[in-house]
């Protein structure tokens, strides 16, 4: 038991009840409302290292990590100190900032596909801009995305989008005109033949293919052997662009992202989460000849009041400096593999069908025999069982993403003792399911 006192959520319940009168659903982002796992959401008071404390005093080992950015652990002292210094100079300039150059150089040095980069304020914003750029560069309107891959909440991407849409049980979102998504083609993840068929059916009309190279928004799904390489070949054959949405995987799977880990280089990449060190940030980048189309260098317009603000740049720079230290990704892989393998072994020992895995500091599992290759496979998971498991783990002091359709994250702050405690809690909970 990780919590130091009997599990109670009185204050969380009170705050959430009040929030429901002030904000739609009581939250600022849908998955936080615990809709898919039942019960009331936990209201956090503070976070530090690998832990979170709620307003009732319960402590949790946190495997959400503010949905990925907290790869060095929450409130890392070096990041906090750097932010204190930066804040003394102002929170936003609305003008060029030397820190943008520093972070831009770090991103360009790290990510194989990026020769130039533009900073924005969120992953959604990065994906919106990169879609416009795909079309501007190719002169074509249609794109291919994959079922269950999430690229933010922009209208044109809310087609079989996984993540929060899947959590709420909605096929897509009201308010999105059919004309907006008419040029968004979809294929099952890991299905090269479906992609080839779409290109054959739409000759000379497809600007490119965008995907999460490792899916984290239908649960955790890895690419089959040859899938990413196949997409690269197909897009080159048709003079179309390949775009990796590495908002979640960038600087997490490896310092250079999935493209470094798997050796497949796209034309464009979107980033977010980790590159802001916990502050709002996004970025997109790629080949110089493509990026030169972005205003003011070129005609494709995109702008943002807070883009490249000094606080996000500062936190991002310090976070990437920490990640460059030797042994970082080896440690993440080691502890995450032990966690993932342990969860699957416990499920088997306690009689529950389960499958899953991990790559570096990202993991996930499903309550189904599997294997899970795509979104349709992911939907076979026993969602009611996951809900009971999630609640049980919460009461044991383990904070997991409140949706079967989200990946989990470890951090450099997680210890072997944290993994031990998590597996002990999982054994207790799965034995009682």
Swiss-Prot record:
Q: Name one GO cellular component term.
A: cytoplasm
PTM annotation (N6-(pyridoxal phosphate)lysine): residues: 273
The protein's name = Glutamate-1-semialdehyde 2,1-aminomutase
Q: Could you say which cofactors this protein requires?
A: pyridoxal 5'-phosphate
Record's Pfam families? Aminotran_3
One GO biological process this protein is involved in is: protoporphyrinogen IX biosynthetic process
Origin organism is Synechococcus elongatus (strain ATCC 33912 / PCC 7942 / FACHB-805)
Q: Where in the cell is it found?
A: Cytoplasm
């Amino acid at each position: 038991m990780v919590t130091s006192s009997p599990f109670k959520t009185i204050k969380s319940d009170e705050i959430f009840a009040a929030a429901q009168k002030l904000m739609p659903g009581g939250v600022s982002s849908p998955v936080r409302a615990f809709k898919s796992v039942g019960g009331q959401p936990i209201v956090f008071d503070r976070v530090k290292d690998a832990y979170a404390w709620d307003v009732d005093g319960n402590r949790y080992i946190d495997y959400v990590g503010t949905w990925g950015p907290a790869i060095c652990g929450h409130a890392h002292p070096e990041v906090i100190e750097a932010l204190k210094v930066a804040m003394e100079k102002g929170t936003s300039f609305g003008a060029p900032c030397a820190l943008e150059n520093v972070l831009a150089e770090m991103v360009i040095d790290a990510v194989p596909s990026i020769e130039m980069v533009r900073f924005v304020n969120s992953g959604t914003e990065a994906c919106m801009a990169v879609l416009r750029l795909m079309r501007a560069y190719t002169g074509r309107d249609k794109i291919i995305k994959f079922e269950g891959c999430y690229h933010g909440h922009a209208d044109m991407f809310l087609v079989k989008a996984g993540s929060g849409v899947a959590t709420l049980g909605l096929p897509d979102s009201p308010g999105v005109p059919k004309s907006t998504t008419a040029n968004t083609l979809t294929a099952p993840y890991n299905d090269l033949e479906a992609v080839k068929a779409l290109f054959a059916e739409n000759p000379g009309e497809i600007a490119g293919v965008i995907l999460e190279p490792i899916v984290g928004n239908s649960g955790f799904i890895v690419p089959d052997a040859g899938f990413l390489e196949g997409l690269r070949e197909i897009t080159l054959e048709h003079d179309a662009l390949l775009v990796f949405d590495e908002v979640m995987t960038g600087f997490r799977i490896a310092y250079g992202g999935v493209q470094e880990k798997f050796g497949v280089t796209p034309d464009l990449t979107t980033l977010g989460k980790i590159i802001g060190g916990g502050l709002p940030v996004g970025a997109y980048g790629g080949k110089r000849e493509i990026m030169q189309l972005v205003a003011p260098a070129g005609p494709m317009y995109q702008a943002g009041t807070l883009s490249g603000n000094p606080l996000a740049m500062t936190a991002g720079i310090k976070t990437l400096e920490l990640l460059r230290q030797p042994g970082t990704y080896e440690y993440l892989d080691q502890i995450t593999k032990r966690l993932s393998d342990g969860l699957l072994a416990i499920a088997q020992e306690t009689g529950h069908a389960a499958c899953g895995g991990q790559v570096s500091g990202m993991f996930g599992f499903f309550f189904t025999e599997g294997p899970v290759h795509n979104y349709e496979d992911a939907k076979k998971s026993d969602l009611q069982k996951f809900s009971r498991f999630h609640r049980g783990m919460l009461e044991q002091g383990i904070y997991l993403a409140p949706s079967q359709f989200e990946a989990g994250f470890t951090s450099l702050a997680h210890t072997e003792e944290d993994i031990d405690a998590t597996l002990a809690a999982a054994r207790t909970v799965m034995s009682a399911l």
